[in-house]
Amino acid sequence: MPKKILFTGGGTVGHVTLNLILIPKFIKDGWEVHYIGDKNGIEHTEIEKSGLDVTFHAIATGKLRRYFSWQNLADVFKVALGLLQSLFIIAKLRPQALFSKGGFVSVPPVVAAKLLGKPVFIHESDRSMGLANKIAYKFATTMYTTFEQEDQLSKVKHLGAVTKVFKDANQMPESTQLEAVKEYFSRDLKTLLFIGGSAGAHVFNQFISDHPELKQRYNIINITGDPHLNELSSHLYRVDYVTDLYQPLMAMADLVVTRGGSNTLFELLAMAKLHLIVPLGKEASRGDQLENATYFEKRGYAKQLQEPDLTLHNFDQAMADLFEHQADYEATMLATKEIQSPDFFYDLLRADISSAIKEK
């Protein structure tokens, strides 16, 4: 019988990306892959879109909140139901291990796997642990982290960032769509790419709409998340969502304006791409993006601008500073030791799974 591995994680793209990097490697090596998540969540959408040979198992999910809400009462029952469903799924599948990328949907499968004696491996991308992973850590065999953790946690392995970006633009697939975009852009202007992510695109969209003069100073690429804004015109390309075109657009840009999500930041670091970070504040997140942005700025990888300070004047000043010191930023990024290849992590995870199985 083939070996089986169970993945979980969802709620945002960032809680799915690493799973989608690892899954094809397990499939190639003959593993049977299953995924537990929310059928209405982005994890189901991304798995379906990938076309990978993965069996998806839907469970009830409840959001984990750090504040009082009457919804917490209803969500207690949803989480309990999700735990029972996870116990049934895992008992039936009998996988060799579970790998979790975090998000509130991941807690019931992690707890269930531990209760059934299955090795549990989890991954934390941010500078500090989210609530879901704080809970999951108690049940984990090993936690892999992108950042070094300040707390001395016995089950943590500092990994660095796992990303599969193309460092060489010549490796990227040719795109007729990209060539069409270039027809509308000026070679005399710098090209800026705005990436807001699933939670933070609106502010960038509004900033670009409110300041049409930006198009006179730069070529603008705006990944909006909103198909109603799609547009290709002089010095402006607005698109709601990209997949195969994502990295070619990153390579095409002279500078990327991004939120503070860990996955995107480390992709930019791996590409040594000049970038400005406008992190989500504590009113829109738990503060993890502020921590990530501060870390990147202190390391000399990037410059940050707080969302309340995102005015045209401040933006132009940030652009001028970044381009003036571009060589310094790029040299610092090229010298980083914080990037790991997917193959490196896959081999490490496989070895840790084997060790955990032998120790049972």
Curated annotation (Swiss-Prot):
Going by the record, the broad EC class of this enzyme is transferase
Source organism (scientific name): Streptococcus pyogenes serotype M12 (strain MGAS2096)
EC numbers, comma separated: 2.4.1.227
Q: What reactions does this protein catalyze? A: Mur2Ac(oyl-L-Ala-gamma-D-Glu-L-Lys-D-Ala-D-Ala)-di-trans,octa-cis-undecaprenyl diphosphate + UDP-N-acetyl-alpha-D-glucosamine = beta-D-GlcNAc-(1->4)-Mur2Ac(oyl-L-Ala-gamma-D-Glu-L-Lys-D-Ala-D-Ala)-di-trans,octa-cis-undecaprenyl diphosphate + UDP + H(+)
**UniProt GO BP:** carbohydrate metabolic process; cell division; cell wall organization; lipid glycosylation; peptidoglycan biosynthetic process; regulation of cell shape
Q: From the Swiss-Prot or TrEMBL record, state where the protein is found.
A: Cell membrane
> To which pathway does this protein belong?
Cell wall biogenesis; peptidoglycan biosynthesis
Q: What is the membrane topology noted in the UniProt record heading this document?
A: Peripheral membrane protein
Q: What is the protein name given in its UniProt record?
A: UDP-N-acetylglucosamine--N-acetylmuramyl-(pentapeptide) pyrophosphoryl-undecaprenol N-acetylglucosamine transferase
The superkingdom listed in its UniProt entry is Bacteria
